[in-house]
Amino acid sequence: VAFGIDFGTSNSVVALADGDGPPRFASFELLGRSTASFRSLLFFDLDEQRPAEPVVFSAGPAGIEAYLDALGEGRLIQSFKTHLTTASLGRTALGPHALDLDELLALFLGRLREGASAALGAPIERAVLGRPVRFAGSRDDQACARAEARLRRAALAAGLGEVELELEPIAAAYHYEAGLERDELAMIADFGAGTTDFCVMRIGPTHRGRRERSDDVLVTGGVGVAGDNLDAALIEHVVAPALGKGSYYREFGKRLPIPPGYYYKLSRWHQLSFLRGSRTRHELERLAQHAESPAALEALMMIIEDNQGFHLHEAVEATKIALSREPRAAFDYVHEDFEVHAQVERADFEAWIADEVAEIAACLDQTLARAGLEPAAIDRVFMTGGTAFVPAVRREFEARFGSGKLSSGDELSSIAAGLAGRARSWDAAAG
């Protein structure tokens, strides 16, 4: 029984490859609907926590439902995969409990494992787990090694007795390869929420199914710029100004700008929970008393205190997706005490994300250069992940390879399917 686990920054997916057919995906219930996505988040109802008792929490779809039922009370933690490279993060206070990142990861992976085991009707005791080429926030190989070690520890603590790690773009290559009838030299581009990863690989019928594939991989590359960075641009330019960014307050006879740090954390999903604390609340209350636009600061406090990160994320994501289809899109965020509405032009959005797109394109060029290849040598470009559909990103690939060489895969399941297929190959070789 071969399992693949795609632990993503925003969403996680578990696949099972049993027999010779295509992988099956664990399915979960969310608000009465079936989904293969297990949202990468944890929710803690602080009223349910008791000293000397295990921490009470929900994860994935159940975490979303518990969060919605709690009407903003409690602690929502999302995008925690982005913290994997952090050397010292401290502990997260959860009522009488205080958990470090390793413990939070183990809670999430354990609940994912339990839910997927029940959904697939088979206990998950060993699996192939995906990892990016370069973890988000990694500045050197030491940071990447720290992140991988942390991921392995958490997987073992979550009940996975045996774990193999595979690079996510290589897993996407295995998924794409499963449908090929002839060999290709492929460029794989995996666009996640926290990282963008590439690999150049020989794939096809003569390569498929072998356990040892290292000779087929010409090069890998990655950069910690991806979907969350594009979300941050929308927060910075559309949402934050309505919440006081760029405005001023008066104190001690001086006119001073509202500190930008609050808005930076607001725009980074993995840092949003850090704003929920008495110190931040007192600082913002003081600023609001002296602000030229106090209502905007009060709205920012409501988003923080009412734990609105999930709802804000949904509104931003909807606008980003719409901008991939249309030249303009509406941004609509509704709180019970205030609303933020805006029309966003695709041209403006592309100007805001120009630096991020340039970083992705530079990593693509560096990956090709390290392989010693010109774009014309690539037979096919397989792109997976939501950012693959952002027109500004897609144009970079069209300019290098031509639109005829580009193909896209299922943004949700490609990685997990490839990981499960790889697990099946390893099991077959071991058997």
Give the location of each predicted region.
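Conserved phosphate-binding catalytic cores of ATP/NTP-utilizing and phosphoryl-transfer enzymes
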Residues: 1, 160-189, 417-424, 428
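Gly/Thr-rich phosphate-binding beta-strand-loop-beta motif of the actin/hexokinase/Hsp70
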Residues: 1-23, 176-213
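Conserved A3 ("GATE") glycine/threonine-rich loop of ANL adenylate-forming enzymes
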Residues: 7-11, 194-195, 225-232, 410-421
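Short glycine-rich, Thr/Ser-proximal phosphate-binding strand/loop in the N-terminal lobe
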Residues: 16-47, 204-236, 347
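Phosphate-binding loop and its immediate beta->loop->alpha context
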Residues: 20-139, 144-152, 156, 238-308, ...
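Short beta-alpha connecting loops at secondary-structure transitions
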Residues: 25-27, 65, 214-224, 297-301, ...
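Active-site nucleophile and cofactor-binding loops and adjacent substrate-binding regions
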Residues: 28-33, 164-170, 224-225, 407-415
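Helical "lid/coupling" subdomains associated with nucleotide-phosphate turnover
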Residues: 208, 232-247, 267-431
